[in-house]
A protein has these predicted regions:
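A short glycine-rich, Lys/Arg-flanked "PGG" loop and its adjoining helix->strand segment in the class I
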Residues: 142-154
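General small-molecule cofactor/ligand-binding pocket signal
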Residues: 31, 110-112, 183-185
């Protein structure tokens, strides 16, 4: 059985690769490796999420389970004056994300090692963006959803993407249970991008 990308300490033999991509008018280079998600190209779900994601200036963003950092790095480039924190439990992914933040000359982002929300336990954000690790199991995905409101400011948004055949509709139901509603903001190639908003007091 191949090593899962959500393992904390990848042991797989290194196979470095490099991805060059244009996203929303900006060019990016991402260094990747074995033992991280979507090593050879940005996966279609992440592409859809990047196309749908809306971030304004001076906003605080959490890229949860960042992998090699594509979502968070693009968000940082789009949010002038904002700040992005990228987190992952995978040590190799965190090292790659830090390399990619520097390589893309991103000054308004930082990468932290840790499981889910642990590295940001006392923080709240305008946006949480995540391509959830469905293969890690329902308990992990449920925590991403149910703990999100504690880490969002009033009016803050949780953005997730999932394959329809891997439970996107069920995921939308869990988001609705935690937030009161969840909308499909984009769909394509068998994926749905979902968004929930934390209501103000």
């Amino acid at each position: 059985m191949s090593e899962q990308y959500f393992a904390g300490h990848p042991k797989s033999r290194r196979r470095p690769a490099e991805i060059h991509v244009a996203v929303r008018g900006h060019s990016f280079t991402f260094r990747t490796d074995a033992g991280v998600f979507s090593r050879e190209e940005i996966d279609r779900g992440t592409e859809l999420l990047l196309a749908a994601f809306e971030v304004g200036p001076c906003e605080l963003v959490l890229d949860l389970g960042c992998g090699y950092g594509a979502l968070g790095i693009v968000a940082a480039r789009l949010s002038e004056g904002g700040h992005v924190i990228l987190t992952d439990v995978n040590e190799r992914a965190v090292a790659l994300a830090r390399t990619n933040v520097a390589a893309n000359e991103i000054a308004n982002a930082e990468v932290r090692l840790g499981n889910l929300y642990e590295p940001v336990r006392d923080m709240a954000f305008d946006h949480i963006v995540c391509n959830p690790p469905i293969r890690a199991g329902r308990v992990v995905v449920d925590r991403i959803v149910t703990e999100a409101p504690m880490h969002l400011l009033d009016g803050g948004k949780l953005w997730l993407v999932a394959r329809t055949r891997q439970g996107a509709d069920s995921l939308r139901g869990r988001m609705t249970a935690s937030f009161g509603s969840a909308e499909v903001v984009r769909r394509g190639s068998g994926y749905k991008v979902l968004r929930s908003t934390k209501a103000g007091v």
